[in-house]
Amino acid sequence: DPPFAPRM
């Protein structure tokens, strides 16, 4: 996952 899209 990219650092600007945190997983929920």
Curated annotation (Swiss-Prot):
One of its GO terms (biological process) is neuropeptide signaling pathway. Its main location: secreted. It is found in: Secreted. GO terms for cellular component: extracellular region. It comes from the Eukaryota. The modification Methionine amide is found at M8. The keyword Secreted applies. Keywords: Amidation, Neuropeptide, Secreted. Belongs to the pyrokinin family. Myoactive. This is Pyrokinin-3. It comes from Mantophasma kudubergense.
